[in-house]
Swiss-Prot record:
Protein name according to UniProt: Sec-independent protein translocase protein TatB
Pfam families per UniProt: TatA_B_E
Residue numbers spanned by region Disordered: 155-176
Known partners and oligomeric status: The Tat system comprises two distinct complexes: a TatABC complex, containing multiple copies of TatA, TatB and TatC subunits, and a separate TatA complex, containing only TatA subunits. Substrates initially bind to the TatABC complex, which probably triggers association of the separate TatA complex to form the active translocon.
Cell compartment(s), UniProt: Cell inner membrane
Source species, domain of life: Bacteria
One annotated GO biological process: protein transport by the Tat complex
Organism in which the protein naturally occurs: Burkholderia ambifaria (strain ATCC BAA-244 / DSM 16087 / CCUG 44356 / LMG 19182 / AMMD) (Burkholderia cepacia (strain AMMD))
Record-linked InterPro entries: TatA/B/E, TatB
Similarity comment text for this entry: Belongs to the TatB family.
The organism's taxonomic lineage, starting at the top: Bacteria, Pseudomonadati, Pseudomonadota, Betaproteobacteria, Burkholderiales
Keyword vocabulary terms for this entry: Cell inner membrane, Cell membrane, Membrane, Protein transport, Translocation, Transmembrane, Transmembrane helix, Transport
Membrane-traversing stretches: 1-21
Length: 176
């Protein structure tokens, strides 16, 4: 910062003593020290803020790089998956080529639209699953129902312990 040696500081002190006098010098020195301390704290705050912003900027760039790499990997995987799915569907349709055209979905074979995967199943099975959704909802375990339902009878911990404590361990009740 400033190159102030011991000799320069002594010279400044002597000049201040001559100019200000011995009665005002301590007050001015305290004020100057407080201002100097504030300036140092302000400079340190600015430095830390700048370094924090630089780190945040670096983290943001790393985040965008990571997201773009993840997106690239995802698109590559989806492209490879679509390619292999198309090959499998073409192989399947060539192996089942002896069947009549009524047995093959019109939208999956021989059209320009993307082929629906043959492994997804028929719509009849889907309709059956939709119809029986209530059966699955009713099979909730009792312990889960007890743990997640809203409590209507709330007790404190002490009351719960007293309720489940055997009579032989309870303290006798005395009124007088």
């Amino acid at each position: 910062m400033l190159d102030l040696g011991l000799s320069k500081m002594a010279l400044i002190g002597v000049v201040a003593l001559v100019v200000l006098g011995p009665e005002r010098l301590p007050r001015v020195a305290r004020t100057a020290g407080a201002l100097f301390g504030r300036a140092q704290r302000y400079i340190n705050d600015v430095k830390s803020e700048v370094s924090r912003e630089i780190e945040l900027d670096a983290l943001r760039t790393m985040k965008t790089d990571f997201e773009s790499a993840a997106r690239n990997v995802e698109t590559t995987i989806h492209d490879n998956l679509r390619e292999h799915e198309k090959e499998l569907n073409d192989t399947w349709h060539s192996a089942v080529g002896g069947l009549n055209e009524g047995s093959v979905d019109a939208g999956t074979y021989g059209s320009d639209t993307p082929a629906a995967p043959s492994w997804r199943g028929s719509t009849a099975a889907l309709a059956r699953k939709r119809r029986n959704w209530r059966v699955k909802q009713a099979a909730m375990p009792v312990w889960y129902k007890r743990a997640t339902t809203r409590r209507t009878h709330v007790q404190s911990g002490a009351a719960r312990v007293a309720r489940h404590q055997p009579a032989s361990l309870r303290r006798p009740t005395r009124f007088l």
